[in-house]
Amino acid sequence: MNRTERFRRVALLMASFLRNLAYLRAFKDVHARIPMDWTRDFWITQGGNCTDIAVLEWCKLFADRADKHHWSRIVADLDAFKPSLLARLGMEEAAYSDYVTSVRRYRDKFVAHLDSDNVMDIPMLDIAERAVFFYHQHLTTQEVSDPLQVFRPLPSSSAELTLYFEHHCRAAAHTYNEVLPPLRTI
């Protein structure tokens, strides 16, 4: 696989992460409206699947240094990338490392395997989201000479990535609002 193909695959993982995160956020907004009937399992499973796929995709990009899509195997200037990422996230190295460990732990203990842990600690994905936006911006401004050519039809700029995410948030919210009954008040 050549470098251009790797960039494209990284962009596909980013898009998948953001789509699933968008669907998850829209799901959380309507969670209280999920009916207590035979469809409930469907809705709960759908929300859980979006969480799990987002976590899996993010781990490929940020948590598994051995993965061929991990940022450390993609970016040219390794010494500059991580400090810039931490600065963008507003995190110290130790806090970021703890966050990566928590996301990886959820993936390993509950998504990839069902280990013996009794408590599922689902990670918040706000930091993961900001990391993906940073990584994408880095690729499109510093690594890829022609982002439009490499990423087409995926977002090839930060502005396009934001629109992509917002579009999927709106699409999911629209779908949920069309299908789920309104919240009943007493």
Predicted regions located by residue number:
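Histidine-centered, metal-coordinating catalytic motifs and their short helical/loop contexts
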Residues: 93-120
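Amphipathic alpha-helical interface segments
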Residues: 1-99, 122-186
